[in-house]
Swiss-Prot record:
The active site is at S37, D329, H332. Glycans are attached at N66, N100, N237, N256, N257, N261, N321. Its EC number is 3.1.1.-. Residues 1-24 form the signal peptide. GO terms for molecular function: lipase activity. One of its GO terms (cellular component) is extracellular region. It comes from Arabidopsis thaliana (Mouse-ear cress). It is found in: Secreted. Belongs to the 'GDSL' lipolytic enzyme family. Keywords: Glycoprotein, Hydrolase, Lipid degradation, Lipid metabolism, Secreted, Signal. This is GDSL esterase/lipase At5g03820. PROSITE patterns: LIPASE_GDSL_SER. GO terms for biological process: lipid catabolic process.
Length: 354
């Protein structure tokens, strides 16, 4: 019965998709992306930060084999999402030279690797804070309004899907390695602390005219190769770190509850919480059944901790075929895994495109 429901929902999405494609128009007027390295398409390239991915072997399986700044060997889940929605190009990184003129009319990408709900996370790594991403979005709105006028611009903003994917850096690159935060907050208390900036962010987006917002849950933090290496049991690199996964589950529960309250209090808002925890956990725990060979080690280098500048052309041991791997580097999914995640997002996101 469960499989039948999934198939029925998938068929509905496909039917809806082809209906939109048949008109030559995407299903929504624009796609706005905000968050961290999981969805950063190159904004960090222009920052003075170590958290970058604009060099080989990143991007080796992307279009023209270019390292665009995406933290993967190829496409991000949001790239697949843009394709499925009927867009013929991906949202341009807002800090890039391409972010001008009519290129902005179908959306933009404001995400920055190492950003988080807590602005302190981004500040520590010299990334773009979520508050600054929102300021950049306001600037973007002014540019679009100048191009097409207020009436059409407002329709673009209200009809656009706004995707937010962040939070992992708050835990993996801040809380777990910061003794001060560890001493002040339990993981549960830290999750509570992050709900306020999340609520404020959604409220601010809503005030700017956004009516379709999607936010991703945390992934199974304890199954990321770098997390297993850094926080797992000594000598045991084959098991997810359960306490980290439990922290993610707790956070995700709070995220769902907070999102429900926001939906109830903001008239006309469609807010969808995208579950990426379970699809990625399924791939990590059952790689072969999902078409993968390896889920404990990443493709890049030794597959244990390498990410960003540690994952480079000189990294010894990088795999030859990333499609066999769930993870490209120590923190980020491969293109093949991103495709699976995107397929799940499409089914879950029906309320945002209907």
């Amino acid at each position: 019965m469960k499989m039948f429901i999934i198939m029925l929902m998938t068929f509905s999405v496909i039917a809806c998709f082809y209906a939109g494609v048949g008109t030559g128009e995407p299903l929504v007027p624009a796609l706005i992306i905000m968050g961290d390295s999981v969805v950063d398409a190159g904004n960090n390239n222009r920052l003075n930060t170590l958290i970058k991915a604009n060099f080989p072997p990143y991007g080796r399986d992307f279009l023209a084999h270019n390292a665009t700044g995406r933290f993967s060997n190829g496409k991000l889940a949001t790239d697949f999402t843009a394709e499925s929605l009927g867009f013929t190009s991906y949202p341009v990184p807002y800090l890039s030279q391409e972010a001008n003129g009519t290129n902005l009319l179908t959306g933009a990408n404001f995400a920055s690797g190492a950003s988080g709900y807590d602005d302190g996370t981004a500040i520590f790594y010299n990334a773009i804070t979520l508050n600054q991403q929102l300021k950049n979005y306001k600037e973007y709105q002014n540019k679009v309004t100048n191009i097409v006028g207020s009436e059409r611009a407002n329709k673009i903003f209200s009809g656009a899907i706004h995707l937010l994917s962040t939070g992992s850096s708050d835990f993996l690159q801040s809380y777990y390695i910061n003794p001060i935060l560890n001493r002040i907050f339990t993981p549960d208390q830290y999750s509570d602390r992050l709900m306020k900036p999340y609520s404020t962010f959604v409220q601010n987006l809503y005030d700017l005219g956004a009516r379709k917002i999607g936010v991703t849950t945390l992934p199974p933090l304890g199954c990321l190769p770098a997390a297993i290496t850094l926080f797992g049991e000594t000598g045991n690199n084959n098991t997810c770190v359960e306490r980290l996964n439990q922290d993610a589950v707790s956070f995700n529960t709070k995220l769902n509850n907070t999102s429900m309250n926001l939906t109830n209090n903001l008239p006309g808002l469609k807010l969808v919480v995208f579950d990426i925890y379970n699809p990625l956990l399924n791939m990590a725990m059952n790689p072969v059944e999902n078409g993968f060979f390896e889920s404990r080690r990443a493709c890049c280098g030794t597959g244990t901790v390498e990410t960003s500048f540690l994952c480079n052309a000189r990294s010894v041991g990088t795999c030859s075929n990333a499609t066999n791997y769930v993870f490209w580097d120590g923190f980020h999914p491969s293109e093949a895994a991103n495709r699976v995640i995107a397929n799940n997002l499409l089914v879950q996101g029906i309320p945002l495109i209907s």
